[in-house]
Structure formats: structure tokens, C-alpha cells
A protein has these predicted regions:
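Hydrophobic secondary-structure segments that place a key small or acidic residue at a functional site
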Residues: 92-97, 107-119, 125-191, 198
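Conserved transmembrane alpha-helices of multi-pass membrane proteins
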Residues: 320, 334-348
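A short amphipathic helical element positioned immediately N-terminal to and/or at the very start
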Residues: 1-9
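A short beta-strand structural signal in non-transmembrane regions
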Residues: 52-56, 149, 173-176, 199-225, ...
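Transmembrane alpha-helical interface segments in multi-pass membrane proteins
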Residues: 275, 283-329
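Hydrophobic, regular-secondary-structure patches
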Residues: 27-112, 131-133, 138, 223-226, ...
Length: 348
């Protein structure tokens, strides 16, 4: 083993090149997995296991789901829906639309605008207003998520955003513990319905039960009502987990594909390096044989050298990749066709 360690110091350039190639492969693979896990973590953390989501069965997401006012009233009459401190049912009827905003530095991208009621702050406790104030339900006002505020022009407090033929003033900035809500704008649901001439048709209903132990009873009442056959209910966490599957899966497959390509190059490079290392050390090998070292011992030394090179390269690649956790990037959410900001994240 001393022989192996001395070879590292004696042939520094060869060792550095080999270790760098392996480190690059590990870095790319780790970065792809961190990106996929970051998307999953962001979307899954968006939903709460204590909240129930109601959507139209044929919809691929909130944007394509429609729930009319009559259906909402039927759902409000179902058992086990919790009441807030004000005595009102804890249901948030939410229209969800997509608008275009200008990105800082040029270009346009889609942004989700969600209409909510005052009940939503009891349903989603992770929402924290960090600057400004909440929107006035009687005015065309918005609060924006932290990620939107950082990336888009005119998404700062005091700015006005034009859509649906009107000007909407931004009055507050919120964060949501790194969840997907930070990539949205929120305004009053009735104001949004009025602006888009949707009468009482919302995209989704989010509600809380008096006890999650009653979920099966609630679901049974929901599914046995023939008027609700076109709709489905699931926990909010499960909904967002399903939303993350396609995007995270695509990123993971793409990352593995790129890693395989890099791996071929790194493997060939490592093989050439080890072959040349053996070829250049024929005299040393002969000397060791004459000193009484067996072929097995010499082979073990070279195998240990290759293994050590790979381990060092892997550790360095993973160490460098770990710094990606300090970066936040954004991509297109395939289900909502809007911006989704997320951070690279190492899985447990």
C-alpha cells in the first residue's frame, strides 16, 4: 500500500487528470439527482398532508380544472369539513390562471396567479408575509412570492402588473418555506373571477377536515354523490407529489443519460492511464518480482491504486456538487406551464 501512495506523489499529473475525470462524472450525476430531488422536494412541500384538494377528474392540473359554483355548494354541504375561528368553513375556492411577465435581463415567462380567500392563511400556515401588507379583497391588488420578486421585472412592491385588461398593484411579498407557492402571485379570488369573466367557476377547492381520521368517511360521501362523479379528491400533498413525477423523472433520466456519456470518456481515460502506468513501470514490476513479491500482491497494488483513484475522484465530485445547494434555479412546470423555482438538494 505504501507503494501505491508513493505512486500518487511520484506521478502527480497523471493522478490529477484521472481523478478530475472521475470527479466530473460524479459531479454531473450528483447534480442531476440533486436537481430532480429539488423539484420533488419543492412540489411535495407545497402541499399539506392535512389539506384536501378537489379537482375535475379529466384535468392534468389546476390550470385545466374547472369547478362551478353549484358544485362548490354541494361540496360545502359534505360532512367533516372543519370550521375556522370565525365560524366559516375552512374551504378556499381558488381560480388559477397564467400570465406573462418580463424576466430580469430580457425575455418572457409564464407566472401562475392564484385567487384566494382570507381562509387560505389558516389552511396554509407556511405562508409568511415578509414585506408590505396583505391585499385588499375589494381592490385589484396582489402579493408575490419571493422567487417571483427576485426574477421578474415589475414584480416588486409598488409596481403594477397589467393583465385581464386592468392594472394590479403589488402590495406585499411572501415566502412559503421554499415551496412552489413562492413562484406564484396571489390576489383575491372574487377579483380574479371578475377580471376573467368566470362568474363563479374556480379551478380547485382546498379544504381542511375536522380530523384527518375522518378522511375516508368524507371521501365515501364525496364519491357516492352522483353529482360529484366528474370530480375527485385527494390530499394536497399527494396531488403535488404526483405533479412532480413527470418533471423530476425527466430530469433524472436526462441526467443519467449525460452521466453515461461522461462515464464512457472517464472510463476510457482511466483505463488508458492505468495501462500506461503498468507499461511505464515494467522495470519496477520486474524489480518487485525479483524481490519476492508475488503476482497477486503486485496485481492487488495496482487494483488498490485504481480503486483509490476512483474513491478520491468520487468524493471530490460529490463535495463540489454539495455546493449547488446554495443555488436556486427555475424551470417550466409541465403541468401548469408556468415558472417553478427550486433549489438543488441532496437526498438523505
Amino acid at each position: 500500500f505504501k507503494y501505491t501512495f508513493r505512486n500518487f506523489t511520484a506521478r502527480k499529473l497523471t493522478a490529477i487528470i484521472t481523478v478530475s475525470g472521475i470527479a466530473m462524472v460524479v459531479f454531473v450525476f450528483a447534480a442531476a439527482l440533486m436537481m430532480a430531488y429539488g423539484v420533488e422536494k419543492t412540489l411535495v412541500s407545497t402541499g399539506s398532508a392535512d389539506n384536501i384538494k378537489v379537482l375535475r377528474k379529466s384535468s392534468q392540473g389546476e390550470i385545466s380544472s374547472i369547478i362551478d359554483g353549484d358544485t362548490e355548494n354541494i361540496i360545502r354541504a359534505l360532512p367533516h369539513i372543519a370550521k375556522g375561528s370565525d365560524g366559516n368553513l375552512m374551504i378556499s375556492a381558488e381560480p388559477v390562471v397564467v400570465i406573462n411577465l418580463e424576466i430580469k435581463g430580457g425575455g418572457l415567462s409564464n407566472v401562475t396567479v392564484r385567487g384566494v380567500s382570507q381562509t387560505v392563511y389558516q389552511l396554509r400556515s407556511q405562508i409568511k408575509l415578509i414585506e408590505g401588507r396583505l391585499f385588499n379583497p375589494s381592490l385589484r391588488e396582489l402579493i408575490v412570492g419571493k422567487s417571483i420578486n427576485n426574477k421578474f421585472e415589475g414584480a416588486q412592491i409598488g409596481s403594477k402588473v397589467k393583465f385581464a385588461g386592468d392594472q394590479w398593484e403589488i402590495v406585499g411579498l411572501f415566502e412559503a418555506e421554499g415551496s412552489g407557492f413562492e413562484s406564484e402571485m396571489w390576489g383575491d379570488a372574487q377579483q380574479l373571477l371578475s377580471a376573467f369573466n368566470r362568474e363563479s367557476s374556480v379551478s380547485t377547492l382546498t379544504l381542511k377536515l375536522d380530523d384527518m381520521g375522518n378522511y375516508e368517511d368524507f371521501k365515501r360521501s364525496f364519491e357516492t354523490d352522483k353529482r360529484l362523479l366528474p370530480f375527485e379528491t385527494k390530499t394536497e400533498q399527494k396531488y403535488f407529489e404526483e405533479q412532480s413525477e413527470y418533471l423530476a423523472g425527466f430530469i433524472r433520466v436526462l441526467g443519467i443519460f449525460i452521466t453515461i456519456i461522461f462515464s464512457f470518456g472517464a472510463t476510457i481515460g482511466a483505463m488508458i492511464t492505468m495501462y500506461s502506468a503498468v507499461a511505464n513501470r515494467t522495470v519496477e514490476i520486474g524489480t518487485m518480482r525479483s524481490l519476492g513479491f508475488s503476482r497477486r500482491s503486485i496485481l492487488s497494488a495496482f487494483l488498490f491504486e485504481a480503486l483509490l483513484t476512483s474513491v478520491v475522484g468520487g468524493v471530490i465530485g460529490l463535495f463540489i456538487a454539495s455546493f449547488l445547494q446554495f443555488f436556486t434555479i427555475s424551470t417550466l412546470n409541465w403541468n401548469s406551464f408556468s415558472e417553478l423555482a427550486f433549489s438543488f438538494s441532496l437526498s438523505p
